[in-house]
């Protein structure tokens, strides 16, 4: 981890942790710690049903890191906007204002599986 109050060396650069399918999502915590250690400014976490829940992973990453920004990508059409806003608000409070949200369109197969229009 960076020294408290230290600025990330590559503040404008980030990395996508846990790409694709994962067997053990806890690996993302180690990836975020390493990203912060080498001076990256942000990590990105995507949503993938039954494999990756960005809010849960972001909470774990926030606890394990000190300075790095944590961004979660959520499917815009798969949960009520107030639920996503509530998650983001809580993550901002719990992470020391290091959390950001990005919205993505859901894959049609996921939408069908979840019964979404």
Predicted feature descriptions by range:
Residues 47, 72-74, 103-107:
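Glycine-rich, histidine-containing beta strand-loop boundary motifs that form or position
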Residues 1-71:
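N-terminal beta1-alpha1-beta2 module of alpha/beta enzyme domains
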Residues 75-79:
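Glycine-rich "substrate-gating" loop/helix at the edge of Rossmann-like oxidoreductase active sites
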Residues 8-21, 81-117:
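Flexible, glycine-rich active-site loops centered on histidine and acidic residues
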């Amino acid at each position: 981890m960076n020294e408290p109050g230290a600025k990330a060396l590559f503040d404008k650069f980030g990395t996508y942790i846990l790409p694709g399918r994962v067997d053990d999502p806890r690996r993302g915590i180690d990836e975020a710690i390493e990203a912060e250690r080498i001076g990256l400014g942000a990590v990105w976490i995507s949503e993938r049903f039954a494999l990756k829940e960005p809010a849960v992973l972001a909470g774990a990453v926030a606890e394990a890191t000190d300075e790095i920004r944590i961004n979660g990508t959520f499917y815009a059409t798969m949960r009520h906007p107030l639920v996503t806003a509530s998650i983001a608000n809580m993550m901002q409070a719990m992470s020391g204002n290091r959390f950001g949200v990005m919205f993505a369109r859901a894959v049609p197969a996921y939408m069908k599986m979840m019964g979404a229009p």
